[in-house]
Amino acid sequence: MPTDCISYQKSGYFSKLIVDYLDKKPELKELYNYFPSIENFKHQIEEKNHNFKNNDKRKILVDALKKQYTNFEISELTQKNIVLLENEKTFTITTGHQLNLFTGPLYFLYKIVSTINLCKELKRNYPEYNFVPIYWMATEDHDFEEINHFNFKGKKLSWNTASKGAVGRLSTKSLTNFFTVFKAELGLSNNAEYIKKLFSDSYLQHSNLADATRFLANKLFGKYGLVILDGDAAALKKQFIPYIKDELLYQNSNKKVLESIAKLKDYSIQVNPREINLFYIEANLRERIIYENGNYKVNNTFISFSETEILKLVDANSEKFSPNVILRPLYQEVILPNLAYIGGGGEIAYWLELKAMFDFHKVTFPILLVRNSAVLINEKQEKNRQKLNITWQELFLKQQVLIDAKTKEYSEIKIDFSEQKAHLKKQFEALHQIALKTDKSFSGAVKAQEKKQTKGLDNLEKRLLKAEKKMHSEKLKKIIELQNNLFPNESLQERKSNFSEIYVEIGEELINKISDQLHPLAATFSIIKHA
């Protein structure tokens, strides 16, 4: 592995479940279909092809996409990809993401680029098929607090407005004040002016968050053929009617997901299923459906249906039913000729709870791929790293661990009292032998003294480490500064910084560099160096 790549397993930023999945632990095998490899896509294509024979589904999908792209400037490649979806030799690779303001954290870009690059790689290996990258916009989510902000140069910029219901339908009118604040942070460079125009064209020229996000993602990635899909569409929901009815009448998803969760007893569970994994959705409303006393009630409202009434509503207005985190993946795979889902560690963790549910419904389970991750580093930072003689493996360490390790490396004194502790232990072993031959009270005194002296050595070791840190404080300060720049708040850069921060520095080079250097099947953190 190149020195400017870190394996996910060694990065320290992934859960035990994801590490074991990447290591292909046999105990997880029944929780997924095929492991992500170029060879396994052949089997996935065959299986999905067999289970997605309905050409009406393809036509409905294409018609829905054409409708959603009305009034949007569309690239030649995206247009071609939409038309190709009617062809039974065309398959999709999908990633999903919330409608975070101005894309939110950097990893949004990595998700999209991972998806685009995997399509390219598959086309090289399976030229007889077509592969279309899909960005599934999470327009039906209702947790506005998760998406109403982003960080720019360490500052949290928030859009404060009242929000109810699905965020995709939320008006963007109140973003004018936010834009005034953001503009002031950006400066006056050519790249800053581009970012201002991009924000304004996206959010101030479109009336709702779904359209604004589509415009933005299309502007950034349209030339790569990205197709952006909004699942909040009546024509698409109609195809999901049998699954909505099954959920309301029999709650099979709850039963099947709980079966999978039982097999994950050694891991932290990402999401727990509800009895009914559906929301009722209207303008300014998205609330859970609860079955109570023979009726279907909409949580936190007075809306209630009998069984007959709700089944009629499903047939007449399936768009009023919104799948939650458990059922949304099923909805996605029912309406798309999809081969793989690309997501972060948390997303892949909850997908691993779902295979039994997919098997029950006889829907092909997609290949699960952990998205690409990266750290962006400029020339000055890279020079500092080399000057300080820090490896990338070291920079991924927790800060305290890193500083302790570098202090020991720089010190001319051995900051390790293991020998002294071993010598002390040996001395007390002799004393314990003497204690066995006399009164019990002496044995207690020996134990207490051993504990006291061992603790004393521990404290002296800590004091020595502290003293050496003072001796090398200048070097250590530079290490802390470098790590804080690359790992803000001791977290991953990709979770804290917005793309605009880097774009202001390097412009279009940002997306070009990411596109050139992210390899979807590599399962490594990429270190991307830029000007």
From Swiss-Prot:
Coiled-coil regions listed in the entry: 447-481
Family annotation (InterPro entries): Bacillithiol_biosynth_BshC (IPR011199), CC_BshC (IPR055399), Rossmann-like_BshC (IPR055398)
Pfam families in alphabetical order: CC_BshC (PF24850), Rossmann-like_BshC (PF10079)
EC number: 6.-.-.-
Keywords carried by this UniProt record: Coiled coil, Ligase
Molecular-function GO term, any one: ligase activity
UniProt KW Coiled coil keyword: yes
Enzyme class: ligase
Top-level taxonomic group: Bacteria
NCBIfam families: thiol_BshC (TIGR03998)
Family statement drawn from the similarity comment of this UniProt entry: Belongs to the BshC family.
Protein name per Swiss-Prot or TrEMBL: Putative cysteine ligase BshC
